Amino acid sequence: GGEAMMIKLADGLKPERSNSFSGSVDWAFNLGHFSSNLLIEGFYTMLNDVFYLEETGFDETTGTKIQERRNGHGARVYGANIDYKIAHGKEAQLQLGFTVQQSRYTEALAWSSDPDVAPTKRMTRTPDCYGYFTFTSAPLKNFDFSVSGVYTGSMLVGHSAGSGVETPVAVNTPKFMEMNLKLAYDFPVSKSFTLQVNGGIQNLTNSYQKDFDKSWNRDSNYIYGPSLPRSYYAGVKVVY
């Protein structure tokens, strides 16, 4: 729920170690007046004595819930990502990337202390795919803008019993596509002094979690996805 929590280290806790392997191809080329760069990368990571948390009870004095950090058997994280950049000077620049990966424990681990909840090999809060893009342009001498986006694929998130659900459940979250817009205009005051006025919208698509827990016994850890709903902002910047 929303109560405080204490994390203790298990006796004989070993350090988590990893071995990683990766390979990539990086290609720079021109498309007419545009310069481009393409990067393709593959990766594989083996984690040994991987850390995980397990509930062990409550502190008798404060009533604080206690979780213990323990060693699991291991985990594997592997996948591939692609990044692409294309630019035409300062007039227009585009950068985008996408990653596909698998994050799995070698043996299933319990994410809840409830014995009726099945353990899982899938790492929680780790999407199997995610990506981004950023487009910036300065079509006028004193005006520029940018459009960016972040894609987060579905992930597994534990939802503990409380005001939201009566029994613990592992939730496959929805996918999110967060879009952002920023506009800026420069007002030259003198040769060495410029006043910039800017504004924009964060999370233009309002891609945001819709099922927050409420009340005193909420699961305060049941939070996922973009950190803010649709938000507007404006600012002034002095450049000299």
Predicted features by range, described:
Residues 13, 23-27, 80-86, 96, ...:
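Residues on the lipid-exposed face of transmembrane beta-strands in outer-membrane beta-barrel proteins
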Residues 48-49, 150-160, 185-240:
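C-terminal beta-signal and adjacent terminal beta-strands/loops
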Residues 1-8, 55-70, 115-118, 217-223:
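Surface-exposed loop/turn segments flanking beta-strands in extracellular/periplasmic regions
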Residues 17-21, 74-78, 125-131, 175-179, ...:
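Residues that define the transmembrane beta-barrel architecture of outer-membrane proteins
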Residues 37-47, 64-161:
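Gram-negative outer-membrane beta-barrel transporters
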Residues 12-70, 76, 197:
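Membrane-embedded beta-barrel scaffold of Gram-negative outer-membrane proteins
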Residues 30-36, 89-91, 142, 188-195:
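Short loop/turn motifs that connect adjacent beta-strands in outer-membrane beta-barrel proteins
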Residues 1-3, 50-58, 101, 105-115, ...:
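Outer-membrane beta-barrel translocator domains and adjoining extracellular loop/strand segments
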